[in-house]
Amino acid sequence: MLEYDKSLKVFADPDFQFTLRNAQISAASSDKEEDYDVLSELLVHRAEHGNQRERKLGISKAIEIVDKVSEDALRGLACFHIVAQINTDAPKLENGLALLDSLYGKILMDKNLPTGTEWLEHLDLLSAIRLGINGINSFKKINEFMPEKLSQYFECGIKKDSDDIQKLKNEFSSNGLPVNCFIQHPLNADNFILDIPRMVNDACITLNQGNSLISIPLNEQQKDILQKAIDSFKTIDLKSEVMNKKFMEYWNNYKYLQKIQVWWDSLPCHFSITQVGVALANAYAHTLDNRIPCIY
């Protein structure tokens, strides 16, 4: 807590004092060091989010049940929350998948994820999740869920041998823009995509002069041409069998992405995470790596 000096005034809040007392009771009821770490994280989150009533209530309730939640259930809860909520904005597909693989690996740590219904019923009893009705609803499988979540990688692109590509290349060349930013689509070998930032104001031309790189900002005409090109590549196609098949080939090249797919696709029933569960998931994930973002 000393890292949060600016929040020390929270100790004067009677409600926080009550929460702290509950944390002490939970700690006394547990003999697992992992529980102490989760409780510490929850107290920090309570200090940081105390002005938001629903969040505060969820954190306070999570503190009361920490000693009652198994580590397997915590791991499954945190994993589900992260897969469902955290995205990647890496411009290249392989970089984005590598980032997700690294993130999931921090939660899994080569341990098994819970299967069956027992861990879900356990979390439901503790009000960390709400179980759906069997047979009424189910989660989308990874091969459908992830393309929707990572839709930026499913731009259709433009046929390599098309007149449209040739016109764009000619326009780039005649206006001092490099044509090597047209690259093969990672999910469709017949098409090109643009390997440039989608915000034209962030784009620049980089020249290699001797041992140094020089960045030259774009003029307004170049920005207009670039924006026009970006717009022509914008169409997303999540129903393309070619791209979906290739995407899953990439996905299965990564150890933890594979494990997540097997686990996610075997979830036995639909459920939703409550504010209590969100607090637990965030706190547990943060104890494993404090660089994992907390998403409430």
Ranges and model annotations:
Residues M1-E64, K234, N252-K255, P268-F271:
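Eukaryotic partner-binding/assembly regions in large regulatory complexes
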Residues Y36-V44, E94, K111, G116, ...:
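Accessory beta->alpha helical hairpin/"wing" motif in late/C-terminal subdomains of nucleic-acid enzymes
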Residues Q52-K92:
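Short alpha-helical segments that sit at the start of domains
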Residues S60-V66, K106-M109, T117-W119:
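Short secondary-structure capping micro-motifs at structural edges
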Residues I82, I86, G96-P114:
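Short helix-coil junctions and helix-kink-helix linkers
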Residues S127:
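Glycine-centered, phosphate/nucleic-acid-interacting loop/turn motifs that mediate DNA/RNA or nucleotide
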Residues Q221-M243:
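Intrinsically disordered, low-complexity segments enriched in Gly and acidic/Ser/Thr residues
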Residues D289-Y296:
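Glycine-rich, aromatic-bearing surface loops/beta-hairpins
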